[in-house]
Curated annotation (Swiss-Prot):
Disulfide bonds join 6-36, 14-33, 22-54. This is Ovomucoid. Its main location: secreted. One of its GO terms (molecular function) is serine-type endopeptidase inhibitor activity. It comes from the Eukaryota. Transmembrane segments: none annotated. PANTHER family: OVOMUCOID-LIKE-RELATED, SERINE PEPTIDASE INHIBITOR, KAZAL TYPE 2, TANDEM DUPLICATE 1-RELATED. Glycans are attached at residue 43. The record marks 16-17 as: Reactive bond 3. Keywords: Disulfide bond, Glycoprotein, Protease inhibitor, Repeat, Secreted, Serine protease inhibitor. It comes from Caracara plancus. GO terms for cellular component: extracellular region.
């Protein structure tokens, strides 16, 4: 199972680095920072489906 450590988030600004992750909502997030901010916003209901585009 793919996991991402989101303990250091949310962050106010994410880098433009492109390393896509696919969330459990079938949305592709451009990087770990954007994904983790979305996890925080979802109160932990959003999870990582897999690394790469959805």
């Amino acid at each position: 199972v793919a996991t991402v450590d989101c303990s250091e988030y949310p962050k106010p600004v994410c880098s433009l680095e492109y390393m896509p992750l696919c969330g459990s909502d079938s949305q592709t997030y451009s990087n770990e920072c954007n994904f983790c901010n979305a996890v925080v916003d979802s109160n932990g209901t959003l999870t990582l489906s897999h690394f790469g585009k959805c």
